[in-house]
């Protein structure tokens, strides 16, 4: 199993050292999230400070950006990292597209499928000189003069993964992408019963072996070197579970466990703006459905129980100031867990 860690994207000066430390600790990838900050620039600093780790956006919000703009970011990061950049894309929800980004909303699965195919066409144009001619319902690209082409990277074309929750986006991932980024708000039962069968079916439809397709995430990890650190990490996860459970769009994740009433109660509090203290509504038995929790010397075992056979890559947050030797050992222990995916190379 592969192990990733999130970069401190709010502090560009810290991104290079953090990525170098992750590489020294044996991590397979570092990732930059797009929440309050854009994810591409932090990875540029990480690229210049490392030689081995993958550099991943997890995820960049797609629709407010033209595929051409994203292609430029991707191409440059791939070039300067010598092929280590992985583009992770997500749609965000309608309200954020329309009200935060002022971006028109259309059927997201169909649009994302077209978005990824447009990116592939742009990549082929730049790498091989193939004429740029892409025409879809949402995007059209047919102008690429030599002056505006960055030219070939002489590398494998950049890998693309997408975030997916529903069946249409999961189908997109299997058909058009190099991997899928599952939502952290997921349980093992939900992935086993609903997500994995869909992915397997759609991969089979296009004749893709599972070893060529990366499944990332699908739950939380909470760990630490002391009982107090584990408790603090678990409480952060508890809050995130409550926050996501308050969103009706994620109610299907609660259904296999008979937790719809909990979701409805949290939705009422969310509509009232009462988020403070909502983590208290998440009992330990619900917390453990969504997360692998334990101290350093047990966390690999918990991750194997929670993610084994389903996920290829997990993201592990460590407490601030964690002992580097302990972190290296956890990474090695998790990497010993079998996984299906063989790598983007």
Which residue stretches match the model-derived regions?
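Active-site-adjacent structural elements that line small-molecule/cofactor binding pockets in enzymes
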Residues: 1-345
